Amino acid sequence: MNNSINHKFHHISRAEYQELLAVSRGDAVADYIIDNVSILDLINGGEISGPIVIKGRYIAGVGAEYADAPALQRIDARGATAVPGFIDAHLHIESSMMTPVTFETATLPRGLTTVICDPHEIVNVMGEAGFAWFARCAEQARQNQYLQVSSCVPALEGCDVNGASFTLEQMLAWRDHPQVTGLAEMMDYSGVISGQNALLDKLDAFRHLTLDGHCPGLGGKELNAYITAGIENCHESYQLEEGRRKLQLGMSLMIREGSAARNLNALAPLINEFNSPQCMLCTDDRNPWEIAHEGHIDALIRRLIEQHNVPLHVAYRVASWSTARHFGLNHLGLLAPGKQADIVLLSDARKVTVQQVLVKGEPIDAQTLQAEESARLAQSAPPYGNTIARQPVSASDFALQFTPGKRYRVIDVIHNELITHSHSSVYSENGFDRDDVSFIAVLERYGQRLAPACGLLGGFGLNEGALAATVSHDSHNIVVIGRSAEEMALAVNQVIQDGGGLCVVRNGQVQSHLPLPIAGLMSTDTAQLLAEQIDALKAAARECGPLPDEPFIQMAFLSLPVIPALKLTSQGLFDGEKFAFTTLEVTE
């Protein structure tokens, strides 16, 4: 854990220090003083009464001794509870289908003042140009948008076709950027454990920063070896004892509650007063509908308090201070002298009801963020352009031949989890011996002209129609699920025509579709409009059967080979436990 003061992120000049000290001593006028407020004490528990004094971007003082201090402006908190700004320890903003600018507009008023993001979705499509755009957005953001340098592009070498590479030389060019906090999730855990030099070179190059992990279900000697390599955290844990063992071995545990992977209920019982400095909250992948209707990190805090009886100071600790310490962001995470004034005022701390947000010492106005969004997005120079180099397809492209009496592998979906099971089904003249089997295909979209890779999917709940998307981790080829080849072709051709996006087909017609013009991943619409479009897509998808809560996000992970057990990439069926390709027909 990188819990030493990292001066790379603590940008304060000597002149600012002198001004801050003068206000702290009571010799100068503060910019803001927040009165009538109680401060939640994340270290000792309980509350601290008294004003919060702000000079510039920083807190100059806290407590009753500043009751009569002068200020240019006073903020009446009306009895609110003040907590540090919330921090998401690991996410891919692209998975929200919002640009970083729009994401800030949607989440900053909810108290999310800091994000640690890995832009490997757009980097897999566009390479370094995608990372550079995220860096430009981070530089101009009010929200603290920090970047982990994407480590595995593609997720697993030789297992899929993606749009670009991201070499170690290119990665090193970004290592010293002021918004970079470390190396993003090292997904090829098998390669790390076996000591592949190319992967160890990446770890060595970023060892002075934070090294993110990714090791779902890993245990035993393999987990020990992965941690020995220097990996510091994991956001992929989905079982209680798995999380406990990782904590015992010195890993920090990121408790994830995204739109598809929902691990909070399984892992929240681990959190206690002792280990909470090693526990963090993250969303990984969360869609705009859930952000609008349920919230972001604020929703996770609320559930910790209401459903798992986590004490207030511990719940807010894992949502801020623990993450700040882990990433060496020691100017964040506490409401204390010298810390950055990222403050969330709560009218109800148990319900996480946000009354007002300040970031870098300035109050945030949601309407101003919305009004400025279009201009700020244009200023960031988004990488527009069609990234779909694929010709339209026909139903014959999805034709599969099955032999009666033979057994075939089926990717079995677990609703609200990213892992799958590998099962099999026997084919007869009447079809398969289970009625929930549909077809799945992945089509590379980067001009390689490969035939679609086809397979079978169980447990998804699709009774009719087809769903297609260009959001399919991590290479973001076209993934389609359907009950008929004709409707699969129709759905795929719609997302090709849109230049990337999502589509629902039923009764031989397109029922709903959403173009995603930036890399086939992100929309330029407002968060509100995007949430409405997602709502329409989900409504259309529900007509196709009892699908997962977030069908498109769940579908997007069916092509990710670094999460077990059975996945489908543009190259074919992949066994995520053996880290090897396998066949559709079971012959062993």
Curated annotation (Swiss-Prot):
Needed co-factor(s): Mn(2+)
Matches recorded under SUPFAM superfamilies: Composite domain of metallo-dependent hydrolases, Metallo-dependent hydrolases
Homology family: Belongs to the metallo-dependent hydrolases superfamily. Adenine deaminase family.
Alphabetical keyword list: Hydrolase, Manganese
CDD domains: AdeC
InterPro entries for this protein: Adenine_deam, Adenine_deam_C, Amidohydro-rel, Metal-dep_hydrolase_composite, Metal_Hydrolase
Record note on quaternary structure: Homodimer.
Organism in which the protein naturally occurs: Escherichia coli O139:H28 (strain E24377A / ETEC)
Record carries keyword Transferase: no
Protein name listed in UniProt: Adenine deaminase
Reactions this protein catalyses: adenine + H2O + H(+) = hypoxanthine + NH4(+)
Presence of keyword Hydrolase: yes
EC number(s) per entry: 3.5.4.2
Enzyme class (EC, first level): hydrolase
A Pfam match: Adenine_deam_C
GO BP annotations listed: adenine catabolic process
GO MF assignments: adenine deaminase activity
